[in-house]
Amino acid sequence: VNTSEKAGFDLMQDPGVPYISNISFCGAQTSFDRTQAGKEGKGSLGYSGSELEGMKIAGNTFDYPFIHGKAIQAAGKYSFVSCSDEAVENGLVTLEDYPVVDYILGLEKEDPASKAYYKTFSSAMQRIMTSYCQAGGNLFVSGAYVGSDMSGTQGNREFTEKILKYGYQGSLTDKSSNQIKGLGRTITIPRLPNESSYAVPAVDCIVPVDTAFPVFTYAPGNLSAGIAYKGNYRTFVLGFPFESIQSEADRATIMAGILGFFTQK
């Protein structure tokens, strides 16, 4: 937060993603009033709570291909390899060589304030994935900003709607809701900072387009959390990170369902 009237770090809106873990937070900042700078006590600029004291907050552990791969392995009869998106964009890896592609986005999104470029689908990746789908591929995508990060331009929206077969309906920022229903299960994801896995402060509500259909909904309510499409190619897209599903058993069951959807005749 950096305006003429307010300053600070709003952990309730976005707690950030620590490198591996973070022990430096004592609590969420509660006072952002610039006129209270230089003062002490409750209400002063920068005053915060104490709810995070003693907590080793989980961050980016850089092992998400392993987490996804473990779920793939549990499904049986499948092998997997992993690579960076840059390897695909630079032509070092060809998606058409693989019957199924799992595109892991996590909390990646474009941020004008960041020096690093973390666009969910770069222009190059859009072209590559379009070719892969048109060749009859099976594409699994998961991430918290698959809709919101692609809603700004008509070209980006056309890619998600015409190729991946989903539209963006808004972001769910109510952190009291951490349950998602689908594939016969009720799963949970962490919405607040914790010691187990990175927090997902906002998730995307994505709706099916064309002949796609909803496969997950946020609970309570019925906002769509994931879609699947079956045509000349197949897509399965989640508006939340797959690796944020807290139960390993749930991840294995859901991955088996996704792979089954891709391979069934």
Label the predicted regions:
Residues 1-5, 98-110, 143-144, 238-240:
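Short loop/turn segments at strand-loop or loop-helix junctions that form parts
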Residues 73, 103-106, 130, 134, ...:
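Sec-exported extracytoplasmic/periplasmic mature domains
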Residues 108-213, 220, 254:
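A glycine-rich, often tryptophan-bearing local segment used as a flexible ligand/cofactor-contacting loop or short
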Residues 73, 93-97, 132-135, 207-209, ...:
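Extracellular/periplasmic catalytic domains that process cell-envelope and extracellular macromolecules
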